[in-house]
From Swiss-Prot:
This is Membrane protein insertase YidC. It comes from Citrifermentans bemidjiense (strain ATCC BAA-1014 / DSM 16622 / JCM 12645 / Bem). Disulfide bonds: none annotated. GO terms for molecular function: membrane insertase activity. Pfam families: 60KD_IMP (PF02096), YidC_periplas (PF14849).
Amino acid sequence: MEKRLIIAVLLSIGVLYAYSFIFPTPKPLTAPGAKQAAMSSASAPALPAAVAPTAGTAPLAAPAPQAGQAPAVAKDVTVDTDLYTAVFSTQGGGLKKFVLKKYKETVGPQGKDIVLVNETAANRYALLSDSREFGLSPDALYSASTGEVKVTNGGKGSLEFTTTTSQGITFRKVYTFSGDAYRIGLTEEVQNAGNVALTGAVHLLQTSRVVEAKKEGRYEVHAPSTLSEGKVKVDKLDNLLKNPVQYGKDIAWSAFADKYFMDGIIADKGSISQVRITRPANDAIQRDIVSPTVTVAPGQRSAVNYAVYYGPKDLDILKLQGNRLDEVIDYGWFGPIAKPLVHSLKFLYKYTGNYGIAIIIITFILKLVFFPLTHKSYKSMKDMQKLQPKMTELKEKFKNDRDAMNRAVMELYKTHKVNPLGGCLPMVVQIPVFFGLYRALMYSIELRHAPFYLWITDLSAKDPYYVTPIIMGVTMFIQQKMTPTNMDPVQAKMMLMLPIVFTFMFLNFPSGLVIYWLVNNVLTIAQQMYINKAVAD
């Protein structure tokens, strides 16, 4: 097979792969895997000073007459930090609303804050607790330790909800907050003030909102995932309409994420035994996070810890949460390439203050790294081009004997020390880097609403006037015209269609990715001019 045909095939495959990566089939939305709360009959974990328990195995003092007695009407409790505002309810001790302060829905001063939780999803709050064995209802009314929590400048705060069940169980939910972190601590504690030992598990019901998938914006990717048995498993929303999903081994976390934001429940020391995912309504999914079964003797207590995360899918922030939560960002097969590129972008941004400039610098660096391979590729193409007249003679001479022609061609390559794949293989090596950079740019929250210059105000969105993709197509055409070729006329025409195909594909690409491809083309043209001159000399 001629070298040019191989290149044509590889480029065609590359186009198909690029198209599938750029326009993936929208993933059905599903609820993040529910996390199980591990109930240990050992000592209760440390709680804020205002609610610190006695030793885990010590008998509990009988509660005061009003202890755990909840008000008849549900009330809201607002938690305000530097990063978010959360509204909890004494109904279920659940999360009613969660608003991010640092991120907006749209570009510009009129953009509203991102809302990750609202009360409309299946008419259920998030982070509700349920246990039939302990007589606890998810809609139970709790008493709150305070009516408002305000945490700033890296300070700490806490909120405690308490209720008493008909079985004589006092149930406490304690949230702990940091002014400078999205991570929220959650402790659920069962205290048995009755006369009979009770056995059961506590369920943490996490409801997440489902939004119709869209081609552009944060809901382009919208799905739940669970890290179970060492693997990240993503569930499809359509399947959940008929069949709930359950995980029951080595659960580290469960999350529900769109393209840029997520909510997640992170296990603490095996605190999750099962995760059950259902779709109770079209606009919601629910994760039932089940704790291991535990027996609580009279006068004893048992507690379980989680970390709750509501916030951006920032690679560095998620890495700090532990339990491999950063793997909620799906870079696919190209993760080992994409992650270093993301870190490189963030590093360069510290010095440039502009992610567009950072992309250009990375493009230039990659071009330098691959220059030896590219030089070798173009030199091989030039050598093949010089042999084209002799190749034509051999084809004419052995037109009726294909085997003889192939032997003669191989002998020609050997005589002139030409590798027919020499111009192709160096380019193939660069393909994983391109897709790795594509994934890095496509799913980096850092590029969301990040401006470049002039009319490009959001590097994660398409060019509103299509200027950069059109220029990119022109540079790709120029690049192809400068590239040595020994194709027949039909193949040459097919290759000239690629700039047109790529231009239409890139019309809806994030402008950050278009800038990369455009700058790469310009550098390739300059490189080709240099190589052509060097070869001629």
